[in-house]
């Protein structure tokens, strides 16, 4: 009779963590930075169909690095959770802290108890407040750990190199133009040869507290970004402005402008992947954590 093969729990967790880190390291970096009027998200992303940065709710936004199909499922689950909580209680009860904790519970459970592979994702959830002191940001790792964002946070494979550059150039309560230029410069120096990133290689959005609409999320269009960075845009005229994000869509984000009222919650298909079931195991039917 052969002896059963044994692997210690410590070795299993170590192998799963190494697997997840390798997957995340292949993703392009995203920076989440606080500035004087809110929070800006800057990521290297040449695709116009697949977003790394999205709106979750009125004052909440989401950024991710890693495997796209996995963090897109998490985004959809977050939108559904926020919509349900805002509908059952009040829109003001939808907070970044609650959403970050929900993501942490789901990712932690899937990492430690899941029979399949761990999720190769790293997330950031940010909430803009009425004043700069009220702004909040949270980083959620593949194993469910949550840390506060202080000033700025970089996600993705080149996070260490980009963070090192940003540490030397970041200014607290700086203007958007200053923060954007520092972020783009840092993303271009990600440990390889220094690169100059063009506006069409970037995805940029802000949570801006000065907006009169309930929804504070705003995408920065390519031409507006070119003006902020002081470079020439590739197309369109001076009249093209920034675009809004229809984050309630299950797929890519639809642009819309001039929206003054928050949109009605939209349904999410039932087959969005196992992660939706994992989140539902943590949340009750009314969108609140179940009692243990």
From Swiss-Prot:
Compositional bias segments (type: Acidic residues): 282-292
Single GO cellular component term: proteasome core complex, alpha-subunit complex
Protein name, UniProt field: Proteasome subunit alpha
Superkingdom of source: Bacteria
InterPro entries reported for this sequence: Ntn_hydrolases_N, Proteasome_alpha-type, Proteasome_asu_bac, Proteasome_sua/b
Gene3D superfamilies: Glutamine Phosphoribosylpyrophosphate, subunit 1, domain 1
Region (Disordered): 234-292
Subcellular location: Cytoplasm
Gene Ontology terms describing biological process: modification-dependent protein catabolic process; proteasomal protein catabolic process
Function: Component of the proteasome core, a large protease complex with broad specificity involved in protein degradation.
Pfam families: Proteasome
Organism: Catenulispora acidiphila (strain DSM 44928 / JCM 14897 / NBRC 102108 / NRRL B-24433 / ID139908)
Activity regulation: The formation of the proteasomal ATPase ARC-20S proteasome complex, likely via the docking of the C-termini of ARC into the intersubunit pockets in the alpha-rings, may trigger opening of the gate for substrate entry. Interconversion between the open-gate and close-gate conformations leads to a dynamic regulation of the 20S proteasome proteolysis activity.
Summary of subunit composition and partner proteins: The 20S proteasome core is composed of 14 alpha and 14 beta subunits that assemble into four stacked heptameric rings, resulting in a barrel-shaped structure. The two inner rings, each composed of seven catalytic beta subunits, are sandwiched by two outer rings, each composed of seven alpha subunits. The catalytic chamber with the active sites is on the inside of the barrel. Has a gated structure, the ends of the cylinder being occluded by the N-termini of the alpha-subunits. Is capped by the proteasome-associated ATPase, ARC.
């Amino acid at each position: 009779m052969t002896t059963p093969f044994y692997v210690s729990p410590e070795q299993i967790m170590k192998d799963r963590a190494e697997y997840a880190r390798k997957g995340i390291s292949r993703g392009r970096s995203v920076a989440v930075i606080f500035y004087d009027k809110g929070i800006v998200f800057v990521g290297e992303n040449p695709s116009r169909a697949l977003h790394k940065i999205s709106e979750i709710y009125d004052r909440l936004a989401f950024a991710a690095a890693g495997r796209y199909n996995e963090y897109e499922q998490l985004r959809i689950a977050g939108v559904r959770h926020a919509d349900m909580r805002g509908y059952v209680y009040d829109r003001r009860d939808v907070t970044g802290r609650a959403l970050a904790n929900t993501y942490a519970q789901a990712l932690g459970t899937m990492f430690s108890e899941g029979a399949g592979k761990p999720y190769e994702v790293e997330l950031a959830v940010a909430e803009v407040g009425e004043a700069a002191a009220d702004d909040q940001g949270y980083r959620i790792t593949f194993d469910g750990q949550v840390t506060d964002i202080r000033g700025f946070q970089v996600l993705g494979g080149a996070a260490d190199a980009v963070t090192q550059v940003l540490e030397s150039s970041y200014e607290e309560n700086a203007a958007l133009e200053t923060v954007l230029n520092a972020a783009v410069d840092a993303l271009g120096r990600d440990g390889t040869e220094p690169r100059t990133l063009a506006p069409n290689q970037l995805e940029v959005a802000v949570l801006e507290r000065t907006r009169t609409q309930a929804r504070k999320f705003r995408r920065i269009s390519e031409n507006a970004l070119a003006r902020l960075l002081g470079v020439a845009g590739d197309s369109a005229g001076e009249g093209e402005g920034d675009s809004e994000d229809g984050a309630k869509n299950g797929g890519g984000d639809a642009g819309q402008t001039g929206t003054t009222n928050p949109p009605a919650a939209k349904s999410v298909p039932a087959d969005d992947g196992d992660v939706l079931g994992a989140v539902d195991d943590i949340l009750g039917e009314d969108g609140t954590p179940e009692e243990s």
